[in-house]
Amino acid sequence: MKVISRCDESPAGTAARATVTSRKFGFVAVTIMLAALVSVHSAFAARRHHAAAAAADASEENAASASNAALGAYSEACVLEPTTGTVIFESPNAHAPWPTASLAKMMLMLIVAEKIHDGSLKLTDNVTTSAKAAEMGGSQVYLKEGETFSLDDMMKAVVVHSANDASVAVAEYIAGSTDAFVVMMNQQAAAIGMKDSHYYSVHGLPPAKGQQADVASAYDQAILARELLKYPDVIRWSSIDTAPFRAGTFILRNTNHLVRTYPGCDGLKTGFYDKAGFNVVATAKRNDLRLIAVVLGSQHKLTNFKEASEMLSQGFLNYEIEQVAKKGAPITQSVALTDADTASIKPIWGGDAGVFVKRGGANNGIKVDYNLPPSVAAPVKAGQQIGTANVTAEGKSVATIALLAPSDVAKSSSMTKRLLSIF
């Protein structure tokens, strides 16, 4: 379903409009669903069907707005459970490339987060603003050439305020130039399986004459979001509502309204320019379940937030994580001890395990198989691995979790052994 652009502006005109607008503005899981997916997909689709039916009943004088409603509130969408990568809803064209606008910055976020994780970057690194960065238009924090901020502060400006000048400064700091950084972005996209995407900039601004727009499908944006969620710094940045910048003389305000209005929402990113429409990649967590919702090409500022929140709510209403194992809790079986004063020990779970299931399902085919030895010889150290447990659901392996000794077990003394032999 194709969104209708407000007008076919020139790149310069679009950029000018974008400038004005932007300144205003651990569980392991597996899917158990066949019929379940169909039913929830139908629930998502039903909302769009009812919207189209309502549009058909509209009067002629409201024909234009009714036509827009019939076309749908967005161009494409996708809802994904990140632990398993399960798609629980996608629009028919969820794999079609779509202009990213500032969602392009999500790839910058991923590269930065990975480099912080592997130690090649530090949050305390000083990033200096180049002349090119200082000249950036659109959403910005008005960096001056030569001005220096920590990488952490620059990333807050990128993620919270969608600052184009900070994006350029960070990209240049990492790769030496924005062109070199764009190469890194496309390499990373290919590495994580984004097949319907291509980046031409580090910021996602409307392309100038002769340039091409950054594009990614709704599904690819969900894949990217899934990768981002592996890094705590990303959620720390994207969950910020407001934050001071430049010693409090500038206040960053999150462009993602859902951080303020949707319970459990803590990210991730928004993007807009005329031909891209309003884009949002949102994530929320309730209890043990996290979901990602991508809505691209909305024609009205708040429509994308409304659609994303409704999609998330449908997901939370229909699915849950069924806990199978909790780290530190004892399992139901015991293991015999030899050369010890006690007869046996009951191993504990070495990690958490859960299964992504349809709410209200039967037992969802969940099974736990313990792999334990007949006995273990003392001494035993607390945390020592005793065996493993394999969690399956409908015959598919969900996780293999280590089973650990809950405490130290000393070897029996010679006197104890003699007494035991007597009795």
Model-derived segments and spans:
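Bacterial N-terminal signal peptides
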Residues: 29-37
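N-terminal secretory signal peptides that target proteins for export/translocation
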Residues: 1-22
